Amino acid sequence: MLAALFTAILVLVPSHARAQATLGAPTAVFPEDFGTIGSVRELPDGRVLVADPLSNALYALDMDAGTRVVIGREGEGPEEYQQPDGVWALPGGSTLLVDLGNGRLTTLDADLAFVDTRPIATGDPRPNGDSPLVVVLPRAVDASGHVYVQAVGVGFGGPWADSVGILRIAGIRQAIDTVARVKRQDVRRSESGGANNRNVEISPIPLSPQDAWGVAADGSVVVVRTGDYSLEWFGADGTTVRGAPQPFDAVRIRTAEKEEYLAAQGRSGGGIGIRIDISNGEIQMGFQRGGGGGSPREIDQYDWPDRKPPIYSGTVLVDPLNRAWVRRHVEAGEPSTYDIFDRAGFLTATITLDNGNRVIGFGNGCVYVVRYDEFDLNYLERYALPST
């Protein structure tokens, strides 16, 4: 009787159930809030750079002392920025800063002095233009300083491609090669104006399936396929390793899921808007983060799929132990869930955080997590990096 009952209980356990763990207690909690934390970069001396595009500030934090100083200032000139959105480690202790408002990439040296700038976008977005449009909004930078971006995949007025390339750019704007191709998010497109004064608006469909990807320090690229939830590692030496598909339950998108998605978009700064204006042959491009959130009353303004894809779109973070942290979609109100995969594509662990919290980066033996309060203000916490 007991054996029969025990067998029945085992049958009821889902085949894809995972043992879950937490990160434990934080080793440091920064006491002051941020408008939104776009990205973090741990400096060699242990300080942490934080780009806050909504507060329009670049901070250097001492997590242990609980202090911060502003690096640079707001403006359009040298040592200035508008909407600092991302910070990435470069060789020699330098840092790459994404300055959205000024449409440029800025290099800071090891002393955090502003060195030089380059435009985010180059090329011609029009069909049959002189050169293809390249928009350098980094998803990752490897230890050699190669920058990785997702190709735009559409010219101004051209068709919307279902898949695009992951581009590796040597020296920020030198040789470009395509590492892999990924499925992109579904969109809704609208156009206005005439041939010489034309506007195109492309709006992503929330929670539509999209491959996610990231880069390890050695330049290996990991792609998470949204169709069957499997990983592919594209090695810097040209080799490819494919992991087995992971079982998953596709979460039905109800009102609660829609509200949670829009709230998360708002507290994380929303998406990046790219504006392209062509007037009398002159091309102007602008970049801005914000406006991605929405109230419950705005839910019906969007097209929604019936179910969530298995994974979050965007960047897959790779930790110092060469493990990919993949955020998995769950029902509204459930803990934030990260599946951790090794270089062979095997699932090795599952980590959960409080609902809505997200992993933002890694440092020397640590994980940085963004926590939100009831007012959607951002706080930065540091945890020990789990070894298994």
What are the roles of these predicted feature ranges?
Residues 1-2, 18:
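Accessible peptide chain termini
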Residues 16-388:
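Eukaryotic scaffold repeat domains enriched in small/polar residues
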